[in-house]
Structure formats: C-alpha cells, structure tokens
Amino acid sequence: MKLVRFLMKLSHETVTIELKNGTQIHGTITGVDVAMNTHLKSVRMTIKNRDPVHLETLSIRGNNIRYFILPDSLPLETLLIDDTPKSKTKKKDSGRVGNRGRGRGARGRGGPRGRGRGRASGRR
C-alpha cells in the first residue's frame, strides 16, 4: 500500500506533524489528498523557538512535511489492509498471437513502402 493511501484513511485522527523547517503541528486530520496535502482542524502550531499558536483550521502542502507522529492507540493492522480494488488485466485470445516480428505492413528501414506519394514503382 502506498503511504499516501494509508494517510488518506486517517481522517478524524489526532496526530502531530513535523515540518521540514522544524515547526510542529498538532491537530485532527480532516483530509489528505494524493499529493499528501494535509488538512487539519483544532490545530496547535508550534514554530521553532516560539510560543504555540492555536488555529481553527490549517492546510499543509505535502512536500513541506517531514513526518507524521501517529497516536499509539491507532489500529495499524486494520488501516494497512489494502482494500483498493485490483484492476483486471485483459486476457488475450490464446489462439491468436499478435505483435510478433515485423510481418506485413511493417514500417521503418527495409519495410514495405505503403501507399506513399504516387511514385511509379520500377520506372526511373
């Protein structure tokens, strides 16, 4: 399972996030998108060497996140189960084999010319 898919399942969980600049953010996840952009509510943001600031909501760009600190009570076994539907691969007909060698109609060096621009074949 991809990390982002796991994080997308963490809605309504309270986590601590550390950013690359050292800022720590504690809040409840409202959503995570495929770019790992994270949206939080009831946020306490502690910028390095400053007093904490309380915010109602906060959105964090995914590439600024260093790591997530998850609560110990989180049921990781159930969250890590990959429940995304698998795409079915199309089966080819067993009697017919395609795309083997150049065969008729091959393009490129030495292949048949095709219809072209109306040059007379054999005349010069």
From Swiss-Prot:
Q: Where is this region: 9 X 2 AA approximate tandem repeats of R-G?
A: 100-118
Could you tell me the keywords of this UniProt record?
Cytoplasm, Methylation, mRNA processing, mRNA splicing, Nucleus, Repeat, Ribonucleoprotein, Spliceosome
GO terms in the biological process aspect are: mRNA splicing, via spliceosome; spliceosomal snRNP assembly
* A Pfam family matched in the record: LSM
Q: Which domain of life is it from?
A: Eukaryota
Answer whether the UniProt record assigns the keyword Cytoplasm to this protein.
Answer: yes
Example of a GO MF term: RNA binding
sequence repeats (start-end): 100-101, 102-103, 104-105, 107-108, 109-110, 111-112, 113-114, 115-116, 117-118
Compositionally biased intervals (Basic residues): 87-124
Q: What is its main location?
A: nucleus
Q: Which Gene3D superfamilies does this chain map to?
A: 2.30.30.100
Chain ranges of the Sm domain: 2-74
- Protein's UniProt keywords contain Cytoplasm: yes
What Gene Ontology cellular component terms go with this record? Answer: catalytic step 2 spliceosome; commitment complex; cytosol; nucleus; pICln-Sm protein complex; precatalytic spliceosome; small nuclear ribonucleoprotein complex; SMN-Sm protein complex
The record's region (Disordered) falls at 81-124
Q: What happens to this protein after translation, modification-wise?
A: Methylated on arginine residues by Art5 and Art7; methylation is not required for assembly and biogenesis of snRNPs.
Q: Where in the cell is it found?
A: Nucleus; Cytoplasm, Cytosol
Tell me how this protein assembles: Interacts with the SMN complex.
Q: Which family does it belong to?
A: Belongs to the snRNP core protein family.
Briefly state the protein's biological role. Answer: Plays a role in pre-mRNA splicing as a core component of the spliceosomal U1, U2, U4 and U5 small nuclear ribonucleoproteins (snRNPs), the building blocks of the spliceosome.
Q: What is this protein called?
A: Probable small nuclear ribonucleoprotein Sm D1
- Organism, as annotated: Drosophila melanogaster
Name the gene.
Answer: SmD1
